[in-house]
Amino acid sequence: MSTCLPIVERFHSLQGEGLHFGKSAFFIRLGGCKVGCPWCDTKESWSIATHQEATVEELSKEAAIAQSQGAAILVITGGEPLHHNLNALCKTIQDFTSHNSRETMPIHLETSGVDEITGLINWITLSPKRHALPKKSLLRACDEIKVVIHQKEDLLFAEEMANQSIKERQISKKTSDENHKISQPHLFLQPGWNSKEGTQLTIEYIKSHPQWRLSLQTHKWLGVL
C-alpha cells in the first residue's frame, strides 16, 4: 500500500532563502503544523484536514519532471514536515529522480526541528523557534540555522541556538553519533517580513557579528512563489 501525505502545494520555482537562494527548486509543501508561529506566512498549511493527500509516487513523478526541466534541488517544507514520517517519500524521490540523472535529486528540508529526523536528507535548514525548541538531534545534523528576527530577544536566541549546535556537535563527535556534522552550520538572520524593527536589528547585528549572514525572502520581493 502506497504512503500518502497531505499536500498544500507543490511547484517549481526558485529557492528564495538561505545559502541556496537563487537555485532552481521543486517544492513540496506538506500540511500540518502544531508550532503555531504568530508571524507565519503559510497559516493555511497548519491544518491537515483541509488538504488533499497525494501518494509518494505521484509526488516523485512530479519531482522527476521538474528535474528534467532544470530543478537542481527538491525542498520539503510546510507546515512542519517532520510531523510526518518522510522515509517513504525520500526513498521514492531518490528512485524516480535517479532515472533522469547519474545522481539522485538532492533533498532539502526546512524544519523548526520540533520532531526527530526521518528520511535521507541531503541538506537541513533549521529554523528554531523560541516557543518551541528544537530537538538536539536537529542541532547536530542541520547544515544551516536561520532565525527570524522581530525583536532583540530573537538575537539572543539566535546566538543560543548557534552555541548549542556547536556544543552538541562536539559531544556527538566524541560519541560517534551518526547524525552529527563536524563542520559548523551556516548562520543566517532573517528579518521578519514587514518588520522595520527586525530589519534594523538584523542589519546592525550582522555588521558587528560577521559570523552571521543576511537571509532575505527574495521570492517575495520578486513576486514569485
Curated annotation (Swiss-Prot):
It is an enzyme of class 4 (lyase). S-adenosyl-L-methionine binds at residues 79, 127-129. The keyword Metal-binding applies. [4Fe-4S] cluster binds at residues 33, 37, 40. It catalyses: 6-carboxy-5,6,7,8-tetrahydropterin + H(+) = 7-carboxy-7-deazaguanine + NH4(+). Residues 20-225 form the Radical SAM core domain. Gene3D superfamilies: Aldolase class I (3.20.20.70). Pathway: Purine metabolism; 7-cyano-7-deazaguanine biosynthesis. Its EC number is 4.3.99.3. One of its GO terms (molecular function) is 4 iron, 4 sulfur cluster binding. One of its GO terms (biological process) is queuosine biosynthetic process. Pfam families: Fer4_12, Radical_SAM. InterPro entries: 7-CO-7-deazaguanine_synth-like, Aldolase_TIM, rSAM. Its cofactor is [4Fe-4S] cluster; S-adenosyl-L-methionine; Mg(2+). Signal peptide: none annotated. It comes from the Bacteria. Substrate binds at residues 14-16, 29, 77. Homodimer. Belongs to the radical SAM superfamily. 7-carboxy-7-deazaguanine synthase family. PANTHER family: 7-CARBOXY-7-DEAZAGUANINE SYNTHASE. This is 7-carboxy-7-deazaguanine synthase. It comes from Prochlorococcus marinus (strain SARG / CCMP1375 / SS120). The lineage of its organism: Bacteria, Bacillati, Cyanobacteriota, Cyanophyceae, Synechococcales. The gene is queE.
